[in-house]
Amino acid sequence: MGNYKSRPTQTCSDEWKKKVSESYAIIIERLEDNLQIKENEFQELRHIFGSDEAFSEVSLNYRTERGLSLLHLCCVCGGNKSHIRALMLKGLRPSRLTRNGFPALHLAVYKDSPELITSLLHSGADVQQVGYGGLTALHIAAIAGHPEAAEVLLQHGANVNVQDAVFFTPLHIAAYYGHEQVTSVLLKFGADVNVSGEVGDRPLHLASAKGFFNIVKLLVEEGSKADVNAQDNEDHVPLHFCSRFGHHNIVSYLLQSDLEVQPHVINIYGDTPLHLACYNGNFEVAKEIVQVTGTESLTKENIFSETAFHSACTYGKNIDLVKFLLDQNAVNINHRGRDGHTGLHSACYHGHIRLVQFLLDNGADMNLVACDPSRSSGEKDEQTCLMWAYEKGHDAIVTLLKHYKRPQEELPCNEYSQPGGDGSYVSVPSPLGKIKSMTKEKADVLLLRAELPSRFHLQLSEIEFHEIIGSGSFGKVYKGRCRNKIVAIKRYRANTYCSKSDVDMFCREVSILCQLNHPCVVQFVGACLDDPSQFAIVTQYISGGSLFSLLHEQKRILDLQSKLIIAVDVAKGMEYLHSLTQPIIHRDLNSHNILLYEDGHAVVADFGESRFLQSLDEDNMTKQPGNLRWMAPEVFTQCTRYTIKADVFSYSLCLWELLTGEIPFAHLKPAAAAADMAYHHIRPPIGYSIPKPISSLLIRGWNACPEGRPEFSEVVSKLEECLCNVELMSPASSNSSGSLSPSSSSDCLLSRGGPGRSHVAALRSRFELEYALNARSYAGWSQSVGTHSNPGLSLEEMNRSTQYSTVDKYGYVSDPMSLTHLHSRQDDSNFEDSN
């Protein structure tokens, strides 16, 4: 039994084929080098071979610096068969090699000139002559993919099964490079399809590994018919190779019953074809093998104590494959290999955090232990999956496992455990995790310095700091001056000892900001990159502050037109981010990160949590970034890799907040608000004050299904249409029942535009008036749904019946007449105010 932790990712045959590939690449390079002739020399040679007089006067001892004789040059520079005959009659030997090791016949074959090939052979050239690498002219034809040249050589007696220095026949080479026509020619002349190369590899092995389906069919169906169960020196059959490299069409073809392929055969490492498909995340191939051949391979363990399920967990990047395997009756999520390790151990060891979370959510037991098979039988070194993750420095997984930990009476205790009976583990970062983090961050900074355009490089001495205007976990934000501009300076604290370091966040934000250029996105001025202690991001200063401050701290009252201008600007900024060549997902869109100019226009800011959508860092799209209160359900639940549609959800909450002047779910803490939206499908109430065209946009925007949400291009179009018809967008015109006139509502509010409680009083009056005017509509609606309401209820009684606070901590009145809110309470009897 082998040690799982020492399982090689490459086999011996892989290493050999790598060297073979390199050797053929060198051969092609040397052939091409022989064709490289200086321009002036080439023109002179073209003149020689184009004029009988010039040809007759040339010296037979002529040589280029690469050792090409006139006979070689005749094959390269446009000579003809008469030149070949004349030169050979004058005594030039066709066997003479260039400095790169090739005779004239090899060059004629590489140039694909059947006429010159025939002339050379008729004039005495040896068809079996070997050049560099043990290659004959037929090998060269197979490498270059020239079927006519190959046929001429074979007609003149070339050995179809001749082997080169690595024991490859021309058929091996044609199968390796995918030259279908050359393969057909070789088979027509009787090539042996079952001859073995240096490591026992046959043409069918090579074509199966490379995915050349038509060549596989030729080898199996024509000529002497290839052995579909032939094994190489490591006992691989063709099915192993096509399963490993994901060639589904070849797998399906080989599994045909009439071919009698053995689907459960193992190699010297104990791997079945299903193992190799799972080790490489080839879901469709694995599915085909299981569905066609049954479950026998599912229970087989290789020498590293891994079943196919373990193998899929080792790969770890295809959760659909893992789900499929778990759906099979023969697979148990907690199955332990001979050394005791489970699929969860494998996922932890290789750092697949998304898969680890999936396995834990589906019943994987993190307390099962594995034993080190390299230890003597008298010693025990039991290790949980947490220890495996800690050993490899996967600190994020260690933290996740601690969160899921279920205490038991006895847990293994070793160097990774704290003394004591609780089995608690040492805190992260692990030693290796710390080294990984520091190394990665240094590399990220160096790469950023190299890639950031010089105009964005700033020195800290260029920046003049004024007052503090904000702060966060990263550090502080200052107002200041840089290059004669008033700017905002985001000063980072360097901290390399946390799983989500400030250095990493800084590098990501700068790499995104430097690529943005749009009037609705905050403008990037530059960054200080010299030293982590001086890291700073400089952007334009937006004097109006944040939308959150405007609505909830200053308690400013905006008319509908002003609100729509802000909404359109933010939507345009987000549309720009999502439509870039490399789309950017903001991941933290909320009213804090919407900044306002003095003229009422808005920009999107703060890209500390943003990511390029094509990022390969697999855990980027599974963490919970940003503010929970504005977070999309799929982000909060971490159940899937979310997309740009998560930004649409956050935007919809911001739009509702802008229109109502309320914080979403102000009566709940942020985590409770996110949980209600994710698990109970609760949404903020869409009251009478929100025009119908916008309310329909809100409902689509915070759809629980991301695919049901609109693109920002559609949002911009709808809101611009509303803005053009703002007079018709008032609450009065969007509801057919009794309503406020546009002037009576807005004039009342604007006339009480003083600071403090006058705003709150105005809002209270507004909602009370809306309640009174809309009572008849509510009574009619309640009767239609079977609810008998008392038309004489007071506003206070209505508030009590809906369990909704009249005034929140910011002094805002929640809309008691929201039909959506009332309906959601009736549909969900378990909903409780968790304030």
Curated annotation (Swiss-Prot):
<dbReference type="Pfam" id="PF07714">
    <property type="entry name" value="PK_Tyr_Ser-Thr"/>
</dbReference>
<feature type="coiled-coil region">
    <location>
        <begin position="21"/>
        <end position="50"/>
    </location>
</feature>
<feature type="binding site">
    <location>
        <position position="490"/>
    </location>
    <ligand>
        <name>ATP</name>
    </ligand>
</feature>
<keyword id="KW-0677">Repeat</keyword>
<feature type="repeat" description="ANK 4">
    <location>
        <begin position="166"/>
        <end position="195"/>
    </location>
</feature>
<keyword id="KW-0597">Phosphoprotein</keyword>
<keyword id="KW-0418">Kinase</keyword>
<dbReference type="Pfam" id="PF12796">
    <property type="entry name" value="Ank_2"/>
</dbReference>
<feature type="repeat" description="ANK 1">
    <location>
        <begin position="66"/>
        <end position="96"/>
    </location>
</feature>
<keyword id="KW-0547">Nucleotide-binding</keyword>
<dbReference type="Pfam" id="PF00023">
    <property type="entry name" value="Ank"/>
</dbReference>
<feature type="repeat" description="ANK 9">
    <location>
        <begin position="339"/>
        <end position="368"/>
    </location>
</feature>
<dbReference type="GO" id="GO:0005524">
    <property type="term" value="F:ATP binding"/>
</dbReference>
<keyword id="KW-0723">Serine/threonine-protein kinase</keyword>
<dbReference type="InterPro" id="IPR036770">
    <property type="entry name" value="Ankyrin_rpt-contain_sf"/>
</dbReference>
<keyword id="KW-0963">Cytoplasm</keyword>
<dbReference type="GO" id="GO:0061629">
    <property type="term" value="F:RNA polymerase II-specific DNA-binding transcription factor binding"/>
</dbReference>
<dbReference type="GO" id="GO:0005634">
    <property type="term" value="C:nucleus"/>
</dbReference>
<feature type="lipid moiety-binding region" description="N-myristoyl glycine">
    <location>
        <position position="2"/>
    </location>
</feature>
<dbReference type="InterPro" id="IPR000719">
    <property type="entry name" value="Prot_kinase_dom"/>
</dbReference>
<comment type="similarity">
    <text>Belongs to the protein kinase superfamily. TKL Ser/Thr protein kinase family. MAP kinase kinase kinase subfamily.</text>
</comment>
<keyword id="KW-0175">Coiled coil</keyword>
<feature type="repeat" description="ANK 5">
    <location>
        <begin position="199"/>
        <end position="228"/>
    </location>
</feature>
<dbReference type="InterPro" id="IPR017441">
    <property type="entry name" value="Protein_kinase_ATP_BS"/>
</dbReference>
<dbReference type="InterPro" id="IPR011009">
    <property type="entry name" value="Kinase-like_dom_sf"/>
</dbReference>
<dbReference type="InterPro" id="IPR001245">
    <property type="entry name" value="Ser-Thr/Tyr_kinase_cat_dom"/>
</dbReference>
<dbReference type="InterPro" id="IPR002110">
    <property type="entry name" value="Ankyrin_rpt"/>
</dbReference>
<dbReference type="GO" id="GO:0004674">
    <property type="term" value="F:protein serine/threonine kinase activity"/>
</dbReference>
<dbReference type="GO" id="GO:0006357">
    <property type="term" value="P:regulation of transcription by RNA polymerase II"/>
</dbReference>
<feature type="repeat" description="ANK 2">
    <location>
        <begin position="100"/>
        <end position="129"/>
    </location>
</feature>
<feature type="binding site">
    <location>
        <begin position="469"/>
        <end position="477"/>
    </location>
    <ligand>
        <name>ATP</name>
    </ligand>
</feature>
<feature type="domain" description="Protein kinase">
    <location>
        <begin position="463"/>
        <end position="723"/>
    </location>
</feature>
<dbReference type="GO" id="GO:1903779">
    <property type="term" value="P:regulation of cardiac conduction"/>
</dbReference>
<protein>
    <recommendedName>
        <fullName>Serine/threonine-protein kinase TNNI3K</fullName>
        <ecNumber>2.7.11.1</ecNumber>
    </recommendedName>
</protein>
<dbReference type="GO" id="GO:0086069">
    <property type="term" value="P:bundle of His cell to Purkinje myocyte communication"/>
</dbReference>
<dbReference type="GO" id="GO:0046872">
    <property type="term" value="F:metal ion binding"/>
</dbReference>
<feature type="repeat" description="ANK 7">
    <location>
        <begin position="269"/>
        <end position="298"/>
    </location>
</feature>
<feature type="repeat" description="ANK 3">
    <location>
        <begin position="133"/>
        <end position="162"/>
    </location>
</feature>
<keyword id="KW-0040">ANK repeat</keyword>
<dbReference type="GO" id="GO:0002027">
    <property type="term" value="P:regulation of heart rate"/>
</dbReference>
<keyword id="KW-0539">Nucleus</keyword>
<dbReference type="GO" id="GO:0005737">
    <property type="term" value="C:cytoplasm"/>
</dbReference>
